[in-house]
Amino acid sequence: MSKKVFIKTYGCQMNEYDSDKMSDVLGAAQGYEPTDNVEEADLILFNTCSVREKAQEKVFSDLGRVKHLKKKGALIGVGGCVASQEGAAIIERAPYVDVVFGPQTLHRLPQLLAERERLNRSQVDISFPEIEKFDHLPPARVEGASAFVSIMEGCSKYCSYCVVPYTRGEEVSRPFEDVLVEVAGLADQGVKEITLLGQNVNAWRSRMIGAASALSSEMADFATLLEYVSDIPGIERIRYVTSHPNEFTPSLIAAYDKLPKLVSHLHLPVQHGSDRILMAMKRGYTAMEYKSTVRKLRAIRPDMALSSDFIVGFPGETEDDFSKMMKLIDDVGFDNSFSFIFSPRPGTPAANLHDDTPHEVKLRRLQHLQTVINDSIKRISESRLGTVQRILVEGASKRDSTELMGRTECNRVVNFCGQPRLIGQMVDVAITETRSFTLRGEVVTQNEVLTG
């Protein structure tokens, strides 16, 4: 009987990608098969996030819930950014944990588990071996028409509030050809949509070698990579996340004019709308510069859907600062957002800033911001009524398993009736109804996809 591994993922899409790679490497090296039932798992892994305090504490709460499974012989591991930040302190707090590993050492999981068994003691490896992990991972295995590809690791921006540079290390780009080989392999498996991942994905840079360039010293930037990915047969859509406003170069903006496969959806975190707060955050741009980038993008793609991150209640935030953030939100018109009250992270400069704003004030501001964003989402959804949207069908609807769901180019979920054979296909859907954050529609494509 094969061994089972249960993986719970917290946080960002980088972690989702890493969790898939954990499953791949354990399957290839030790025959583990994934399971959604933690009770039957031989190995339980938590791939953690340390961006906010609540996410970090939830890990220890979840660890406590599976502690009893040790009696059945299950092994327990903690990976991700909390593991990188806390290291051996996790073992001190939860001594029943068997392995602790960082984002850059997930490829060493089989060796860590073997050492745990051989030495009969917990193992910790949270080193930063740069990009080594990609050299030791098996070829990607996918089910479905969409896939993530990590193209870089770490962050070198050192925003004053952010723990990522300390948990994932400095920015390191994957080699140009490695990325193209992985994308081509996924396309051969039927993947139609690729999402390129990185903490600051548009900061990617790599030397072009081999057939890709006659000049071995030529450097490729992110826009160049997008062009080459776009040329890979079978790839019909390209997304990427997360981008940094400071890395939005003229060549990247121009890519939206040259590459029709590059979708009209962008997650471009602004974090705040007050220049004073942006400076305290060490973001490196002003609200006007951010809006200038948006204007240039929408001059090329008027229907560009934008999502962003917002931090409410950063130390020293005044009502005037908050009003400036709300003005930016009104000026830009966001299709979605991820907004949170500031959470001080140990070891970051912002954790030491004086903060005298009452929590109830921060909560009121957050609720107001989210109400405004939700109203914007509703207006944008209503503007889609009566339009025909090109949908990549992903699978059964989460609301109703008898229906299908997919995403528009602008990343809006659409539910509709259709045959299972449409899964993995691109179809045209007429939008007939809007809901809070999703759309409903009817398939209007009339071709071999529907009749074959």
From Swiss-Prot:
- Annotated coiled-coil positions are none
Query: Which keywords describe this protein according to UniProt?
Result: 4Fe-4S, Cytoplasm, Iron, Iron-sulfur, Metal-binding, S-adenosyl-L-methionine, Transferase, tRNA processing
The record's annotation in CDD domains points to: Radical_SAM
Q: Which GO terms describe its cellular component?
A: cytosol
GO terms assigned for molecular function: 4 iron, 4 sulfur cluster binding; metal ion binding; N6-isopentenyladenosine methylthiotransferase activity
Matching entries from InterPro entries are given as: Elp3/MiaA/NifB-like_rSAM (IPR006638), Methylthiotransferase (IPR005839), Methylthiotransferase_CS (IPR020612), Methylthiotransferase_N (IPR013848), Methylthiotransferase_N_sf (IPR038135), MiaB_methiolase (IPR006463), rSAM (IPR007197), rSAM_horseshoe (IPR023404)
Q: What cofactor is needed?
A: [4Fe-4S] cluster
Q: Which SMART domains match?
A: Elp3
Q: How does it assemble?
A: Monomer.
Q: PANTHER family per the record? A: CDK5 REGULATORY SUBUNIT-ASSOCIATED PROTEIN 1 (PTHR43020), MITOCHONDRIAL TRNA METHYLTHIOTRANSFERASE CDK5RAP1 (PTHR43020:SF2)
Outline what the protein does.
Catalyzes the methylthiolation of N6-(dimethylallyl)adenosine (i(6)A), leading to the formation of 2-methylthio-N6-(dimethylallyl)adenosine (ms(2)i(6)A) at position 37 in tRNAs that read codons beginning with uridine.
Name of this chain's protein:
tRNA-2-methylthio-N(6)-dimethylallyladenosine synthase
